[in-house]
């Protein structure tokens, strides 16, 4: 400190005076700050009190606000309920208003109805009084009628008693006359038995003739099939030659005739037929006919039959059932080839045609008929052969007409014509048929029905009995089968007398009329009465259960 230019005493004095001032200033500042701190503490305490008071007020205000909000929500919900209630009340008011209007209207209607009912009630009362008066009058008249009719019944009872007494006496007289006639009946039965034995002998001879003629017909069918096959071959050769000469033949036919024909198919079909058809084997009847099942149908001819019909009552009783049977078996009058190809549209025969049917008067056919190398002398019908195809079954029907109208129908006075020409069509089932007439009228709901016949076929009673009592024997193929090479034929030809092949016409039927005389008439009279009862028994005695017919 000695080295300094100032003296230390002076510095010490100056520093002491300055520090005092600083201390004083500091004390003053401390006092000032203390006063300010005290004032601030007081103001802070006051503000703290005010803050607490304000916080309490704020809390009370928040509680009031929450209460106000809750109250507002409650009031809003109440207001909404009141509004909905008001709407419901308005709807109810509208409904009640409409109901009130409807009730007012219904009340008016009920008043009007009440007035009407009152007037009706008055009218009904008056009507009741009137009906009561009329009812009393009716009761009185009814009592009078009752007394009158009671008296009439008493009179009728007395008359009926008298009638019974008279009839009793008459029946007693008839009984005595019947007892007296018993001896005559026994004598007649003995004579009828003898006649039946004679008829059975005639039937045996006739059946033998039938078998012979069936063999002849089988041979004729074979010859006819071979002839048909040769004709098909010739036609096929002609068509092939025409196609070679005119390649556009099919187009020309279509242009000129307006018909579309497939010649290629026809040629192929014809070749198949010629390849598959053969007539070298013989016809054999395998099974015997069912005589009992075919008896009723053979005694009843429904489609142009050539058999006379003298027992109309028995035949007409089964007409409905036989017609339905005929519809079910529409193929029985034709030869059915099961394995033949289908028929073509040009009616070219593809297999064996049906054999011509045998006339039922076979016993009266002359021996010139049995020659196989000559065709029948009766002219054929102009109706073309019919070809139908059902499930590859080929069916051909030959129809022969027997137009010998001028034969000896009246050569013998002991014979009567039993079936005459009748070309009308019957449109209905009639209970009666006429036998002895010539009529070409169409019947529409008439009470009588003529027996349809083949064209102009007239027979006598002798031929009629020969046919009707042996129809089952003529149909030898009724339930059997006829076997040929290349085809199988179901021989259900139960309607051989239906007019499709009656080649043995009236000429042969009536030429035999003079040969029988009175015996024929007696035989026909006997058979007309007992035909339907004895046919099955007689025919069953003439055939064995199984036999074969070999050509």
From Swiss-Prot:
Keyword Metal-binding: no
Record SUPFAM superfamilies: Myosin rod fragments
Main location: endoplasmic reticulum
Chain residue ranges for the region called Disordered: 1-22, 285-551
Keywords, comma-separated and alphabetical: Coiled coil, Endoplasmic reticulum, Membrane, mRNA transport, RNA-binding, Transport
Stated family: Belongs to the SHE3 family.
Protein name as annotated: SWI5-dependent HO expression protein 3
Organism expressing this protein natively: Candida dubliniensis (strain CD36 / ATCC MYA-646 / CBS 7987 / NCPF 3949 / NRRL Y-17841)
Gene from which this protein is expressed: SHE3
């Amino acid at each position: 400190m000695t080295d300094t230019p100032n003296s230390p005493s002076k510095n010490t004095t100056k520093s002491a005076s300055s520090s005092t001032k600083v201390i004083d200033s500091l004390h003053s500042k401390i006092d000032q700050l203390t006063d300010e701190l005290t004032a601030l503490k007081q103001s802070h305490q006051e503000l703290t009190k005010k803050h607490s008071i304000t916080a309490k007020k704020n809390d009370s205000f928040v509680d009031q606000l929450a209460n106000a909000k809750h109250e507002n929500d409650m009031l809003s919900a109440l207001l909404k309920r009141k509004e909905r209630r008001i709407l419901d009340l308005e709807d109810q008011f509208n409904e009640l208003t409409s109901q009130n209007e409807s009730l007012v209207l219904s009340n008016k209607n009920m008043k009007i109805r009440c007035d009407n009912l009152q007037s009706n009630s008055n009218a009904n009362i008056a009507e009741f009084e009137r009906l009561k008066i009329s009812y009393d009058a009716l009761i009185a008249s009814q009592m009078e009628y009752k007394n009158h009719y009671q008296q009439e019944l008493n009179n009728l009872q007395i008359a009926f008693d008298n009638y019974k007494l008279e009839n009793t006496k008459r029946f007693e007289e008839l009984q005595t006359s019947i007892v007296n006639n018993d001896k005559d009946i026994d004598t007649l039965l003995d004579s009828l038995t003898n006649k039946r034995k004679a008829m059975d002998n005639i039937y045996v001879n006739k059946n033998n003739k039938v078998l012979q003629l069936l063999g002849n017909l089988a041979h004729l069918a074979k010859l006819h099939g071979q002839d048909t096959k040769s004709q098909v071959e010739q036609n096929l050769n002609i068509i092939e030659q025409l196609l070679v000469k005119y390649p556009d033949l099919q187009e020309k036919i279509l242009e000129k005739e307006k018909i579309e024909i497939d010649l290629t198919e026809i040629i192929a079909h014809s070749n198949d037929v010629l390849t598959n058809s053969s007539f070298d084997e013989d016809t054999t009847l395998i099974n015997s006919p069912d005589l009992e099942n075919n008896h009723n149908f053979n005694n009843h001819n429904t489609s142009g039959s050539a058999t006379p019909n003298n027992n109309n009552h028995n035949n007409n009783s089964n007409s409905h059932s036989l017609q339905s049977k005929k519809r079910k078996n529409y193929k029985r009058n034709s030869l059915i080839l099961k394995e033949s190809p289908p028929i073509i549209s040009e009616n070219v025969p593809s297999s064996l045609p049906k054999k011509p049917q045998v006339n039922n008067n076979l016993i009266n056919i002359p021996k010139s008929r049995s020659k196989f190398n000559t065709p029948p002398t009766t002219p054929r019908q102009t109706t073309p052969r019919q070809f139908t195809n059902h499930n590859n079954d080929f069916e051909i029907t030959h129809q022969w007409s027997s137009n010998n109208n001028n034969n000896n129908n009246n050569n013998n006075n002991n014979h009567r014509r039993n079936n005459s020409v009748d070309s009308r069509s019957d449109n209905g089932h009639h209970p009666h048929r006429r036998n002895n007439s010539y009529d070409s009228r169409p019947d529409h709901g008439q009470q009588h029905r003529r027996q349809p016949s083949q064209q102009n076929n007239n027979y006598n009673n002798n031929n009629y009995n020969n046919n009707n009592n042996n129809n089952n024997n003529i149909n030898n193929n009724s339930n059997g089968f006829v076997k040929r090479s290349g085809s199988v034929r179901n021989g259900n030809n139960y309607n051989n007398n239906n007019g499709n092949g009656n080649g043995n016409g009236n000429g042969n039927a009536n030429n035999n009329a003079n040969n029988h005389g009175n015996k024929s008439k007696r035989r026909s009279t006997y058979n007309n009465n007992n035909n339907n009862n004895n046919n099955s028994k007689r025919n069953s005695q003439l055939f064995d259960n199984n036999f074969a017919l070999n050509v």
